[in-house]
Amino acid sequence: MMDYPIVFVPGLFGSLGDDVIKGTGDFSFGFAEKIYRPFIEILNSMGYTENINLFISYYDWKKSVLESVDKYLFPDVEKVKQRTGTDKVILIGHSLGGLLGRAYMNYFNPITVDKLIMIGTPNLGTVNAYYFWSGGKVPYSKLEDDILYNGLKIGFILYYYIFKKIKIV
């Protein structure tokens, strides 16, 4: 188990509540429950417990990224730190939630984040991210000649082989 609590930020359509659609009640995963619940259960199996050291930062995905961070993620991180008595959190963001995590790091309070983990986050925009998701090939070859691209590619391959050997108990 990690030393810091996890704050998970779901992706587009991953939050449902009165702030998103009036009359739907308190925040939850809503229709995305079947998508996110298995991930939460994996974190539970690693020793994380919801509302103890695992928290969900729901938000109104119709708002801009910065507005969502300001209204939802930033206050949630502050509440988690106060509740757990820690000075840092681990942010895990899926898809649009990863963009909120990145905005938090860039414009809010990065010193309070031990790690930012982005899963399926469209950092290059949704169209470019789709090519990786659908088959791993970029539609133009100039990118493959780029030094930064090749460095990231090698880094991901090394990351995969290193963490593939680590067993999670």
Locate the predicted segments by residue.
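N-terminal non-catalytic accessory region
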Residues: 1-149
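Alpha/beta-hydrolase-fold enzymes
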Residues: 141-169
